[in-house]
């Protein structure tokens, strides 16, 4: 199979979908890897490293898309990339379709086979979402701490405080991978941290593994509202796999928050769990509503591309190899790869996305028989 790796073109997105080491593995299995020139530059990988790994360097994205049987990406295809996608071509990337009807419809019209990293399940976990969730969770506190500084429009609060000066209050909505990593980072900096979640089992686990400055609270609208007036940094970290994130904080709720408090909504790529959050970029990451600073960058890990690219390839490569070996039709018979299938041959096959837009959903097994 010809596996194509185009350069990412989302604003200030410097990750690449495959390391040279990953290219070596694919080439060793008999596949042909085509990489757009400079695709790995932002992550510190030269064209020569890909050539040494056995890959071919192509001069444009158009060539990569035209030649490849399977496209590997990091972020969802941008409009000009969708225009290059073709019927029967496989695309393996983060799609987050439930947050973007226009992209969903465009891909349905393209007729490509769309396998989403973020919905691939293994024993109840999301192994291809986990590494980027880990990065985003840690970054949410780094970026939130910076946004709390007065020159950034924040309250001028140091997360860890000082001897004789109280630390900041960090409230984390969701105790999954993102929330856990955010809590670890904030606690490590000395903040007082509260994690809200709906799973008692998860909260028992967090109580066991977290330091003493982290507490858990059963999530409810009342519990969230009770914490907002004293919250310095609010991290949105809720996830419903493949579906739009639930809205937990309304615009009206912001009025009870402190002036200069900060919200980092990591769920923004799934629609966001804060009503006032809309996607921003690394170039202009923040905006202010009701006196509250909002950080809503949808590709946070893109700011640390080298770390993120290694983490991504480490997780995705076994599934990339399997998908390249099987092809889309056979892959739909594999439990894990079938869970990643969102669109097959121009038809939607992921219920949460269908529900988000009121579209028809189809059985992946039935679609496989028609290929």
Regions found by a protein language model. Give the residues of each.
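Glycine-rich phosphate/diphosphate-binding loop of Rossmann-like nucleotide-binding domains
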Residues: 6-44, 151-236
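Short acidic low-complexity segments
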Residues: 54-67, 217-227
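Phosphate/diphosphate ligand-binding glycine-rich loop within oxidoreductases
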Residues: 66, 70-148
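Short glycine-/small-residue-rich Rossmann-like dinucleotide-binding loops
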Residues: 69, 75-76, 95-96, 238-242, ...
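Adenosine-phosphate binding glycine-rich loop
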Residues: 118-159, 167, 268, 273-371
